[in-house]
Structure formats: C-alpha cells, structure tokens
C-alpha cells in the first residue's frame, strides 16, 4: 500500500473531518483525499482574514468547488489581537493558537471531532512554531504522520491533476 492509500485509509477511519484549507498545495491535496473517502463528511474550512490576500480566498473557493468538497469560511481579524499587533517573537505560535481555537469551536458547533491540516514532513526541517502550537491543540497532521514530503505532495497533486501541484509557497503577510 502506498502513502496515499495509507493516508486515505487513515482519513476514512476518522469518519468526519474538517480540513484547515488555505487552497495551497498541501491543504488542497488533503481536501481532495478527504472528499474522495468521506464524501459529505468532509469539509474544507478557510479562515478569511485581512492578512490573507483576496486572491488567495478566491482561489480557495474555486479549488473547493473543483474538488467538490463542502467549503465554509470563518472570519478572523488577527490585527485586533493585542498580543499579535505587539509583534512578539512568538507571534506565529500565538497566531496559530488563535486560529486553531476558532476552528476547534466551529468544528465542535458543527459536529466534527477531528481537524486536520496540510503540514508536511518537510515542514519539520524549518523553524515552524505553528507545528508546535497545532500539535498542542490536537490538530491532526496526516502528512507528517505518514512522512510525506513537500516534493511528494507536489508529485501526488500532479498525478491527481490538481492545479496546485506547482503553486509557489505563500508567506504569511505578517512575517
């Protein structure tokens, strides 16, 4: 069984899944897999924020439509958080905690127990305070669990004809 099959089986075992969906390479592949195995029990959840370019929000809408996954939005204005506008050294950690909290609340209110994101095995090579924050928050990282690298995600995405397979990485506007 290859990695994609193992991830699909793991997704299936979750019964219902919220995918934290940015419309990037990683979350698009994860949303596609979730939609294929869970059908209507998968939802892509996008945070709509002033720190996310409008173009990215529109692309996320289009990608979710292409995949056929239910797509929901949560509005968040990180710029209203005193802790974040002070720009502390751990702002990425704090921002991820804030985002995870609103996603967890949405999931709970809508009957979902499991939330997954597109963090991948290659992300562990960089300084990523969001990995620590989201792990603490109980967010599932299937691409890390199954040791799927960014290169593999691009390759799988290309094979599945996802238009994001060669999409460049997008840095956070707060960085």
Task: Give residue spans per PLM region.
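ATP-dependent adenylation/nucleotidyltransferase module used to activate substrates
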Residues: 1-159
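Histidine/lysine/aspartate-rich catalytic loop segments that bind and position anionic ligands
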Residues: 149, 158-175
């Amino acid at each position: 069984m290859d990695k994609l099959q193992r991830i699909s089986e793991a997704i299936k075992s979750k019964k219902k899944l919220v995918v934290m969906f940015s419309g990037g390479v990683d979350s698009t592949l994860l949303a596609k897999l979730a939609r294929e195995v869970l059908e209507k029990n998968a939802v892509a959840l996008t945070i709509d924020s002033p720190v996310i370019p409008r173009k990215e929000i529109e692309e996320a809408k289009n990608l979710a439509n292409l995949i056929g996954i239910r797509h929901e939005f949560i509005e968040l204005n990180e710029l209203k958080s005193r802790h974040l506008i002070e720009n502390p050294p751990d702002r990425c950690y704090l921002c991820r905690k804030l985002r995870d909290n609103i996603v967890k609340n949405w999931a709970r209110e809508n009957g979902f127990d499991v939330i997954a994101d597109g963090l991948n095995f290659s992300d562990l090579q960089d300084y990523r305070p969001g990995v620590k924050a989201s792990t603490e928050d109980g967010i599932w990282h299937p691409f890390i669990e199954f040791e799927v690298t960014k290169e593999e995600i691009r390759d799988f995405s290309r094979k599945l004809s996802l238009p994001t397979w060669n999409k460049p990485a997008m840095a956070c506007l707060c960085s």
